Amino acid sequence: MNQIYWGKPVSGFGDLNGEIIIVGLAPAAHGATRTGRVFTGDKSADFLFKCLFKSGLSNQSNSEHLKDGLKLKNTFITLALRCVPPNDKPTKDELNNCSIFFKEELNMIKNKKVIVALGKIAFDTCIKFYKKNNGLKGSFKFGHGVKYHINGLTIFGCYHPSPRNVNTKRINETKMIYLFKRAKKLI
């Protein structure tokens, strides 16, 4: 099947008045880079949106293409990077180059109360943002379900819904849904 790829930087989407922000690493090569919408059209999206739907944070359990009718409820999804990093391993320069876009999206969401960071790099990107822009001090260790209160926000660490993490059972629906429900209780 021949498809035309979006092939441009991918920005966040969702409820601009949302109280929950989900932060991922980067657009998937054959997901968001193909479709133009973050967490759309790949295995990570399949797992994530099944969990978001069961948690009451989306109107449907699938995210396949831009015109599939998907709507997030009180939630906005963004990325640490806007383009696919080679071998899914971003360099420090790539993260720094995208930090301005990350900052703009975080600042755009005025009602944010909870951030769920999907994976260590997304988590570290959030912490770095608050250290640089809000004077945050200290060290913060990533782990699934860790919770930190930072500048009036709560930040959760969550294992990324990658096929590797799902197939090895590092993350499963029960764990992810439980974490999203914990996030909802804080809003």
Where are these regions (language model features)?
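A polyanion-binding, active-site-adjacent surface
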Residues: 1-187
